[in-house]
Each structure stands twice: as structure tokens, then as C-alpha cells.
């Protein structure tokens, strides 16, 4: 199942996999930027799904969105370039 997320700063991402560190077994989110050169990133899973405080309001660092929402946001971003 494809999973898409929007970062609290506005970037769009596709979650590629949940990976485990070979030594510590710590889990990481592996995700692809859906903008620019499409860089692949990793982040500890607990950080990926954490909340951040923006001017006193807690918001999800990465908010899960549907594929339809992702396509609408991508189209909107491309129109502003």
C-alpha cells in the first residue's frame, strides 16, 4: 500500500519502507521527496511520526494524506513554480 505524507513545512513525500538498523535494530522511515531531484531520506521512525510545536500548537511532523490529496497538492505546487 502506498503511503503519502505532507511535512509540516509543506514538502510532499512517499513512504518507501520501514527499515531496521543492522546493529541496533532501531527502525527508520525511508521516504522519497516528491519534489526537486526526488532525494531519498531516512529518519528514526519515532521522529517521523512525532509532533512538533509550531508557535504553541502541536502538529504532526508528517501528516498522512491520500493519494488523491497528494496529486492535488503536487499539481498546485507545480502551478506556482
Residue ranges of predicted features:
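Mixed-charge, low-complexity intrinsically disordered regions
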Residues: 1-81
Amino acid at each position: 500500500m502506498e503511503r503519502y505524507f505532507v511535512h509540516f513545512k509543506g514538502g510532499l513525500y512517499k513512504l518507501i519502507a520501514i527499515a531496521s538498523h543492522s546493529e541496533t535494530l532501531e527502525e527508520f522511515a525511508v521516504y522519497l521527496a516528491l519534489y526537486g531531484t526526488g532525494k531519498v531520506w531516512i529518519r528514526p521512525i519515532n521522529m517521523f511520526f512525532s509532533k512538533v510545536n509550531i508557535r504553541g500548537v502541536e502538529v504532526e511532523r508528517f501528516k498522512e494524506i491520500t493519494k488523491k490529496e497528494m496529486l492535488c497538492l503536487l499539481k498546485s505546487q507545480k502551478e506556482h513554480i
